[in-house]
Curated annotation (Swiss-Prot):
Regulation: induction: By derriere.
Name used for this protein in its record: Fibroblast growth factor 4A
A Pfam family hit: FGF
Compartments where located: Secreted
Species whose genome carries this gene: Xenopus laevis (African clawed frog)
Taxonomy of the source species: Eukaryota, Metazoa, Chordata, Craniata, Vertebrata
GO MF entry, a single one: growth factor activity
GO CC field: cytoplasm; extracellular space
Amino acid sequence: MTVPSALVPILLLGTAAVMVQCLPLSFQRNDTVERRWETLFSRSMGEKKDTSRDSDYLLGIKRQRRLYCNVGIGFHIQVLPDGRINGMHSENRYSLLELSPVEVGVVSLYGVKSGMFVAMNAKGKLYGSRYFNEECKFKETLLPNNYNAYESRKYPGMYIALGKNGRTKKGNRVSPTMTLTHFLPRI
């Protein structure tokens, strides 16, 4: 090989390297997406990776909260071991719920002590379910007063609500403008 013919492959490699660096972002590797997938995979394997606080909620972080409804004397929603759901004025072990995102803006409510999910049937009645199903999904909406409303995902227009005596109200008889559908997540 002569000297000029040896320079041709070097020039081609150099040109290819410059072209790869100048590619549009859509053709380059997306480290953010790959980091999120790695984090999701590590969580399913029981490992915990460090992530930023902002992305944790989007990645399926479970929040343990008590949902407080400021109606009547004020009640915390509780899930009892027999599947009944009602409100109790004072905090107790059955009022601790685990809120888990299942889709964007949709959560499931799980009674930590009772081991049951909050669910709503077609008539708007709340009940405790041992197994997760479509009736256990609720759309979480942040209201202007900084309270949350929980609308059934399967039955739109039906909301979780507590009456002034602490008993649940049927979801089809309430609207998000009524204070008995407003819940404040408390730690």
